[in-house]
Design a protein with these regions (language model features):
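Residues forming the flavin
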Residues: 2-380, 384-427
Length: 428
C-alpha cells in the first residue's frame, strides 16, 4: 500500500466511511485508517450473532478504490503525515488532506465500587456482547444517561441477558419533554418506539443513579438512589455510562483549535468542517456529539470539501443543521445531575491503571503536576478514562495530548522524529 494519499481519513465509523467513499468518488487516492480489525466504528460494530447492520454493510461495500488500513493506530504526528502502529510495525503515512472522523468514547464517572470486575460502561458492555462475551442468563443493571442505555439494554436482551432495569439519571419531566420533541424527527421517534417495544417488561426508572457497587471478587449488588429512596439490587453485571465525549487527542496534537461544551473539548470547525489547521477537516462526533445521522452527513461533506467540491457540501448543510439541532436537544435534556460529581469518596480509585485514589489528587491544580506526583493518567488508556472523569468533576481540564496517542512498540517510540516542546503539552 502507498505511503501517501490525497485524502487520509482517520476513523472507519459512519463519518469516516462516508468521507472515504465521497472522496474516492471524486477520483482521489484515499486511505481509511482505523485501530479496529473491521470498519464500522463503535455504533456499527460487528455482532457475532447478527452481523453488522445493513446500513453498515452497504457503506462498507461502497468503498471502491479505498485502501482500508485496519489495525492501524495513530501514535504521533509528523509534517503532513501520521506515524502509525501497524501489524507489521511502524510506518509513516503522508497526506494531502486529512479528515478526522475519530468518533467519541463513553463518559464514565467514578463511584465506590466502579472498578469491581463486572462493572463496565453501558456502551462498553454492548460492544463486548456483540463481540461474543457471554451474557446469557446474567442479571444486568443498566444505568447512566441518554438513549445509549436503551440501545445497550436491547443488545443485551437479544443475547439472552436478564436486564433487571434501566436507570436514567435525568428526571421524568425532562425525558418526557424530550420525547415530545421527537415528532420533529419522525425516524428517531420510530426508532425510540421500537426500542421501548422490544424492552417491554424491563423497568425504566427516571431520576435514578448508581450510588455504590458491592462485591468481593466481582460485583454482587448495587445501591441505586431514586426519587422514592434507596434500593439495592443483586446483579451479575452493572453497565453504567453517562453519554459520550469526543475523541480529540489527534486533533489537539495537530494544533487544531478546540471549542468547549462544558468541560470537554470538541474540534472547532467552520460551516464546511475546516479546522484551524490548513488541510485538516473534522466530521461527526469529533466536532461535537450529534449522532449517527450527523456523522454520515458530515463525513460526506468533508469528503466533498477535501477534494475541492464545496458546492456539493453546501447542498448538505440544511440536513446537517437539522440533525445538529437534535444533538443539541439531546444535550439539554440529558444534562447530568450535579450529585453525580460527588459520588466518589476519598478512597475511590480514580486512575484504575495506576491505582490512584481521589484523595491522592487533592492539592493539585493541573493534570501535569498530578501526573508527575502520582502517575495518574500514565497507564494504558493515557488518561482517557480518569482524565475525562476528573474534568467532569471539575478537578482540572485536559488541555493538549502527548504522543503516543495509543500504546506502541518501543521501536516505534524510539523512532519518533517529531516531539514538540513540553510547553505544547501543558495540562496533559
Amino acid at each position: 500500500m502507498p505511503d501517501r494519499y490525497d485524502v487520509l481519513v482517520v476513523g472507519a465509523g459512519p463519518a469516516g466511511l462516508a468521507a472515504a467513499h465521497t472522496a474516492a468518488a471524486h477520483g482521489a487516492r484515499v486511505g481509511l485508517l482505523d485501530a479496529q480489525p473491521r470498519p464500522g466504528g463503535q455504533v456499527w460494530r460487528h455482532d457475532v450473532r447478527r452481523q453488522a447492520p445493513r446500513a453498515a454493510r452497504d457503506a462498507i461495500e461502497k468503498l471502491h478504490g479505498v485502501d482500508v488500513l485496519a489495525n492501524h493506530s495513530v501514535v504521533s504526528v509528523e509534517s503532513s503525515a501520521l506515524r502509525v502502529e501497524a501489524p507489521q510495525g511502524s510506518r509513516s503515512i503522508a497526506y494531502g488532506s486529512l479528515i478526522l472522523a475519530t468518533g467519541a468514547r463513553e463518559l464514565l464517572l467514578p463511584f465506590p465500587g466502579w472498578t469491581l470486575p463486572g462493572v463496565t460502561g453501558a456502551g462498553g458492555l454492548q460492544a463486548l456482547t456483540k463481540q461474543g462475551w457471554p451474557v446469557t442468563g446474567k442479571r444486568v443493571v443498566v444505568a447512566g444517561s441518554g438513549p445509549l442505555l436503551l440501545a445497550a439494554a436491547d443488545t443485551l436482551r437479544k443475547h439472552g441477558a436478564n436486564v433487571l432495569g434501566i436507570f436514567e439519571q435525568a428526571p421524568a419531566t425532562t425525558v418526557r419533554a424530550f420525547a415530545r420533541q421527537l415528532r420533529h424527527w419522525p425516524a428517531r421517534a420510530v426508532q425510540a418506539a421500537g426500542l421501548r417495544l422490544r424492552l417491554a417488561g424491563v423497568p425504566y426508572r427516571f431520576g435514578s443513579f448508581v450510588r455504590r457497587a458491592h462485591g468481593e471478587d466481582a460485583v454482587q449488588r448495587v445501591d441505586i438512589e431514586s426519587p422514592g429512596g434507596m434500593q439495592t439490587l443483586e446483579c451479575d453485571l452493572l453497565a453504567v455510562g453517562y453519554g459520550l465525549v469526543p475523541n480529540t487527542e489527534l486533533a489537539q496534537m495537530l494544533g487544531c483549535a478546540m471549542d468547549y461544551l462544558g468541560p470537554h473539548p470538541h474540534v472547532s470547525v467552520d460551516r464546511l468542517l475546516r479546522t484551524s489547521v490548513e488541510g485538516v477537516y473534522a466530521a461527526g462526533e469529533a466536532g461535537g456529539i450529534g449522532g449517527l445521522a450527523v456523522a454520515r452527513l458530515e463525513g460526506a461533506m468533508a469528503g466533498h470539501v477535501a477534494t475541492g467540491h464545496s458546492v456539493a457540501a453546501h447542498a448538505l448543510l440544511p440536513q446537517r443543521d437539522r440533525e445538529r439541532r437534535f444533538g443539541a436537544l439531546l444535550s439539554r435534556h440529558f444534562a447530568l445531575d450535579a450529585r453525580l460529581r460527588s459520588l466518589a469518596d476519598n478512597d475511590t480509585l480514580i486512575c484504575r491503571c495506576e491505582d490512584v485514589t481521589l484523595s491522592e489528587l487533592d492539592g493539585f491544580t493541573d493534570a501535569r503536576a498530578a501526573k508527575l506526583a502520582t502517575r495518574c493518567g500514565m497507564g494504558a488508556c493515557q488518561g482517557r478514562i480518569c482524565g475525562t472523569a476528573l474534568a467532569e468533576l471539575g478537578r482540572f481540564p485536559r488541555n493538549g495530548a502527548r504522543p503516543p496517542i495509543f500504546p506502541a512498540r518501543l521501536a516505534t517510540l524510539a523512532g519518533l522524529t517529531t516531539l514538540p516542546s513540553d510547553d505544547a503539552y501543558r495540562g496533559s
